[in-house]
Amino acid sequence: MLTQSIRRQFLEYFKKHQHQIVSSSSVLPHDDPTLLFNNAGMNQFKDVFLGKSYRDYNRAATSQKCIRVGGKHNDLENVGHTSRHLTFFEMLGNFSFGDYFKTQAIRFAWEVSTQVFGFEPERIWPTVFREDDETFELWTQYVPAERITRFGEKDNFWAMGDTGPCGPCSELLYDRGSDYGNATKPSEDSSGERFLEFWNLVFMQFNRQTSGVQNPLPKPSIDTGAGLERVINLKMGVNSVFETDILRSIIAQIELLSGIAYHPQDQQSAAFRVIADHLRCLSFAIADGVQPSNVDRGYVLRKVLRRAVRYGRTLKLEKPFLAEVLPQLVSTMGSDYPELVKGQDRIAEILTIEEEAFIRTLKRGGNILNQVIEKSRASHQIISGDDAFKLKDTYGLPIEEILLIAKDSGLKVDEPRYQQLEEEAKQRSRHVHKTVHQIAGENIFADFVKVRGETKFAGFTQNSLKSSVVGLFVNGEFVEEMQSGQEGLVFLSETPFYAEMGGQVGDTGTLENSNSKFSVEDCVVPYKGLIAHKGKLNTGSLKNGEMITASIDKKRRQKIANNHTATHLLHWALHQILGEHIKQAGSVVDPQRLRFDFSHHKALSLEESRQIEDLVNQKIRENLPVKCYEIKYEEAQKKEDIKQFFGEKYGSTVRVIDIDYSKELCGGTHTSALGNIGLFRILKESGIAAGIRRIEAVTGAEAELLQRQDEDLLRTLAQQLKVPIHQVLEKLEKLQEENKQFIAELKEIKKKELNVLINGFIKKIEQLGNTSVLILETALSVEELRLCVDLISDQIPSAVIILGAAFPDKCQILVKISDDLVKQGINANEIIKILMPIVEGSGGGKQHTAQGGGKKPAMLGEAFKQIRIYLKEKMNVK
């Protein structure tokens, strides 16, 4: 394929010119919480440009996977409707870290453009920053001055932020000819279609101060980026990036799947382009460990997937289809990006699960939306913000889907009102947790640190030490003395107590001297660098400046350390059993148990749980030492085998927990050898959010106790069932089968008894127009009501059946509508929604069946009276 060839030739060219060829980084940014996804080739070198880290080379070239779907660079809504916008693309780039500058960068760009890309020299138009005479002069060595265009800061000046590295840039544009517009130079081409940008050279030569002053950098650098898809677009001479080899092959697969031919100018053509692009975006993101969810980048990914599904429906693709197109993507890009091949099955599974869930949402909310549309047409041609919010909040229908369907129906949505309700809901859901930070606000602790200094933590090597009291905090203020019986915070100059952080709970213990004893119930960080001992003074009084002995509860600390190290083992084991996509999403470590949240798209099977448990226990038995050491953060960044976590802020020096095969940056306390953990048992595995699973586990004595309880339960069952232990399961299965038979026989007996009643019920059917209607209050149980409704509908195939039963403090109602009457507009769910307010209850269902329960059984008769009136109006019966 041409794309593969150009990518390879680009990298080979720069390799010949002493550039280090660096593999594309993940689309998931490393240690950069400012980015949702990597969106440029320079992202992985950001710290190098900022001088925060260093590489063994000063020249580099890459082909970087990029995703642009949020923030400043958000191309999502344009994708499918223009010839060049993509959410996923590859960026070719060459970089200089204080080595070469403008002269060589321009020469490299010219040679690659004309020799590697094979572009006609006379069609290349450089642009420069209006004040950058140096770059203008350099370009005159390659093109006539009249083909060099000057632009202002908006187009030709680049900055990393309000402050920091910045500099002019020079773009390379390619003149596609008069077929793409009448403009004769770039300044006349407002659409950007004729003079298409394909490469941008950034000259980082200044450091912008907060005052706005730009000082020259001691070592200017180069950052360039060329969109591979645009290069291929120009190389092939086609109208759009979607007609290039890789994307067009995906579109061809969509044609086969949908049975609809792709014609670029047709109204339906946008759907082909959206699906082709979004499949690449989704597949690469999932391969790199991102999963669709309701938060952060997972939310953005879910939004992309649902947009693809919505456009798929315009091509009559009503069932999950993305996984069926995936093999085409893997076949064209898998050789260059093996993560696609390795993760293909998992990508397909996640895509299908997400599509199925969204299709269910569309079906559930779609019927209600149709009713809202009819109501809106009858009023002011506007779907109210309240209705839109209810569709989203109650039925899960995305606002994007509501807007799209409304537009297709010739309606508008009251978006300001919708946004108001959305914001109000967010405000209601924000819970305020009272912590030490809110006792008096952070300012008081910030001032305290400035005066008294940070707390020195010595707990990695000492369980007990002598220290001086530097602060006492009682009832929201600092005091000079704490009295017996008072609760508060004690601050020390040095402490062995670990403060709650990184999921690990704080230590407990005592602070004491000859005059007093303070029980430490928790240890927290109220402000960066400050450790607070939270608890109660049991005896005596405690004053600022006094010396005390600070002692942690050693047994408790050891249990916590064992559980924390076991958490690292669990994390490693999950990678081995489930795959490299596993990412930590949270953890809690306390003396009793550990809890670990991680990204995964489905529940663990019994076999997977057993494999994970067995692997962790195998490693515990091997009893390897657990090494803990500190290194410079920039050194840790260079080591690919050390795990660190996105969004976590690390200092210049970091602590590594090294178990040979598992290395993580971690500031917590750990056991000295794996054998100390003893035993590992999984208590529970569950889902806590879309795409996030949770494992709860115990170790040591707690695990032994759990094992003993399981054994005791098994022995008790064997005794009760009067069989040996190895036959318990067989006996239970036999009893279950017998129970099923008994229940079936009881149902048959009940049916025979009810048939007598049913004959009487059928005689009470009334005719409303041509429709058979049975509305009846009975003295049946809920189970009997269900049986009766089914038996009556078997005998009367076309009817509205509404049966109710009153009990002393509640009532129950069941509704069933035959298929022919549903088609005439009679809806069981609508009926139950009318009945429930009258009996002060709640309920719901579908078009054919619904049920509900109420708190006012005495109102059952009135409810049935009202529903008769409703049905008469619905059927136009007087």
From Swiss-Prot:
Chain sites annotated for binding Zn(2+): 564, 568, 666, 670
Major location (coarse): cytoplasm
SMART domains, sorted: tRNA_SAD
CDD domains linked: AlaRS_core
GO cellular component: cytosol
InterPro entries, per database record: aa-tRNA-synth_II/BPL/LPL, Ala-tRNA-lgiase_IIc, Ala-tRNA-ligase_IIc_anticod-bd, Ala-tRNA-synth_IIc_core, Ala-tRNA-synth_IIc_N, Ala-tRNA_ligase, Ala_tRNA_ligase_euk/bac, DHHA1_dom
EC numbers: 6.1.1.7
Cofactor binding, per record: Binds 1 zinc ion per subunit.
Catalytic activity: tRNA(Ala) + L-alanine + ATP = L-alanyl-tRNA(Ala) + AMP + diphosphate
Ranges in coiled-coil conformation: none
Subcellular localization(s) per the UniProt record: Cytoplasm
The protein's required cofactors: Zn(2+)
Keywords linked to the UniProt accession: Aminoacyl-tRNA synthetase, ATP-binding, Cytoplasm, Ligase, Metal-binding, Nucleotide-binding, Protein biosynthesis, RNA-binding, tRNA-binding, Zinc
Record note on domains: Consists of three domains; the N-terminal catalytic domain, the editing domain and the C-terminal C-Ala domain. The editing domain removes incorrectly charged amino acids, while the C-Ala domain, along with tRNA(Ala), serves as a bridge to cooperatively bring together the editing and aminoacylation centers thus stimulating deacylation of misacylated tRNAs.
Record function comment: Catalyzes the attachment of alanine to tRNA(Ala) in a two-step reaction: alanine is first activated by ATP to form Ala-AMP and then transferred to the acceptor end of tRNA(Ala). Also edits incorrectly charged Ser-tRNA(Ala) and Gly-tRNA(Ala) via its editing domain.
Name of the featured protein: Alanine--tRNA ligase
Protein species of origin: Protochlamydia amoebophila (strain UWE25)
